[in-house]
């Protein structure tokens, strides 16, 4: 049979394309030469093109620990068909160096050959996680006894009169009502008063209760509606002998738990502050990672416990398919935390958001900064605020320079591409809190303040807080820690900043976030 010239052309082109234009992995985890890596980490390789799953084999992975020796494992291809996951059969050992060599020969579905990979990393010296209960007790200013947190099934499907509520339900006092939006209010109180319980609650604009669910022991954080119509909240759990960990509880519209999300790879303390359910069925969340660090070069304790943060993306099967650790990217000296204490809360992250291009925005309270993380490579695209700020500010209050916002919470991306955040304002003189909206020019690195709301008189929330823009242009502000001392817990403002709705709870009550979502017989769509 005579072969055509066209056949030979495509054959030669295919060979040249494979040899001269080899493919590469866009993302690899753990990062090469990284330190303090979890003993239970998986290995992640991501290509920009779909992988030929039939060519994947555990034999392509040569994983060796200097103490634990050779590690066999299993290989999976994630649901994006681009991300290869290797799960060692046994954990690594503390304080060992791990060498990973991936053979050349893995192919994309169109036959392109991916290169070999060689990375090294060092594991954590810890054989067991550090107990975080004392750190969290201080963070949330808890005076009550720590118990296992457990949501009870008491909820109601209609508006309730005050005298039909439990005796420990917090009183809601509406102080202003001026044509607020129609959505229902979603929040959970954090009580510092023994006579008042912790509740997930859905409220009408007049303060009456649509649904509630009591949380026994600690509290629920960030009660909200997910894009799929389910609801979620963050849950702190304290297990004997005092080790703390967190999780996110997903519920149906009857407030019945249907799923649980936690960080993987051995990062046990899922920080229950931010959980995103993405359109592709994946989820984003992050963990606190306490590690022993010699802080004497910074004037601190040579045996300090320092907390880093670990962002994870989980696929629909809850495999970790993306992992980003502050240890790998952020210098210790970027933090405004006291570096001389025995326990250093270095980062104190509190919120995740996804930008219009799919990349991650990460709010770090103790750095007074927001960073944008490239979700395909893990690289930092930019830093807004803090010691490494890359932006020039326009229309801002120059008396707040250089940290125009500080110790912030609750980063969100608006449909027009602008971002909102709750500026706690800890570094303002004097301190005051506000909601802000910035228009970012990522190319020219400018941040233009296009909206802000300061309460009159000023309110200072030393911790927590939220800002949410509604579809009708109104904005919701949750005042976080400030409401525990008699300030408003919730304020809704019109586009002209006149107050549409405001209410308080008794002293000793605060809310991590206060939000609004549509609610009728069920839940309509919601933004993350």
Task: Give a label for each model feature.
Residues 16, 31-32, 59, 78-80, ...:
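Intrinsic-disorder/low-complexity regions
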């Amino acid at each position: 049979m005579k072969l055509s010239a066209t056949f030979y052309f495509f054959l030669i082109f295919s060979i040249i394309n494979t040899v001269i234009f080899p493919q590469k992995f866009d993302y690899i985890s753990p990062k090469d030469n990284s330190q303090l890596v979890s003993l239970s980490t998986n290995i992640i390789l991501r290509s920009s093109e779909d992988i030929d799953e039939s060519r994947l084999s555990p034999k392509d992975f040569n994983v060796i620990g200097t103490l634990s020796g050779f590690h066999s494992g299993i290989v999976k291809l994630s649901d994006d068909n681009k991300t290869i996951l290797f799960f060692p059969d046994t954990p690594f050992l503390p304080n060992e160096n791990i060498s990973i060599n991936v053979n050349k020969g893995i192919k994309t579905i169109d036959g392109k050959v991916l290169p070999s990979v060689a990375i090294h990393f060092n594991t954590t010296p810890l054989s067991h996680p550090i107990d975080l209960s004392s750190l969290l007790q201080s963070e949330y200013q808890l005076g009550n006894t720590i118990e296992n947190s457990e949501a009870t099934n008491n909820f109601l499907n209609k508006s309730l009169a005050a005298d039909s509520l439990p005796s420990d339900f917090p009183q809601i006092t509406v102080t202003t009502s001026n044509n607020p939006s129609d959505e229902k209010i979603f929040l959970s109180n954090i009580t510092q008063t023994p006579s008042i319980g912790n509740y997930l609650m859905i409220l009408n604009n007049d303060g009456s209760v649509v649904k509630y669910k009591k949380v026994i022991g600690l509290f629920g954080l960030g009660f909200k509606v997910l894009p799929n119509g389910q609801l979620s909240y963050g849950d702190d759990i304290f297990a004997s002998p005092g080790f703390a960990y967190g999780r996110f509880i997903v519920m149906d519209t009857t407030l019945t738990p249907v799923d649980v999300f936690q960080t993987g790879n051995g990062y046990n303390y899922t920080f229950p502050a931010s959980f995103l359910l993405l359109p592709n069925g994946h989820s984003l969340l992050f963990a606190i990672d306490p590690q022993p660090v010699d802080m004497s070069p910074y004037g601190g304790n040579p045996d300090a416990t320092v907390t880093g943060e670990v962002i994870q993306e989980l696929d629909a099967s809850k495999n970790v398919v993306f992992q980003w650790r502050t240890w790998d990217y952020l210098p210790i000296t970027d933090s405004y935390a006291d570096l001389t204490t025995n326990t250093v809360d270095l980062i104190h992250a509190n919120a995740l958001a996804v930008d219009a291009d799919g990349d991650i925005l990460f709010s770090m309270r103790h750095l007074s900064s927001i960073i944008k993380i490239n979700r395909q490579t893990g690289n930092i695209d930019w830093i807004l605020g803090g010691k490494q700020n890359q932006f020039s500010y326009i229309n801002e209050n120059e008396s707040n320079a250089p940290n125009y916002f500080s110790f912030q919470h609750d980063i969100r991306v608006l449909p027009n591409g602008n971002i909102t955040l709750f500026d706690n304002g800890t570094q303002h003189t004097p301190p005051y809190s506000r909601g802000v909206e910035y228009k970012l020019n990522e190319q020219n690195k400018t941040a233009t303040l296009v909206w802000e709301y300061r309460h009159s008189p000023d309110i200072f929330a030393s911790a927590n807080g939220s800002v949410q823009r509604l579809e009708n242009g109104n904005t919701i502000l949750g005042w976080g820690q400030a409401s525990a001392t008699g300030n408003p817990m919730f304020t809704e403002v019109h586009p002209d900043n006149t107050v549409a709705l405001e209410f308080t709870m008794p002293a000793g009550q605060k809310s991590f976030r206060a939000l609004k979502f549509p609610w009728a017989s069920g839940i309509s769509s919601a933004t993350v």
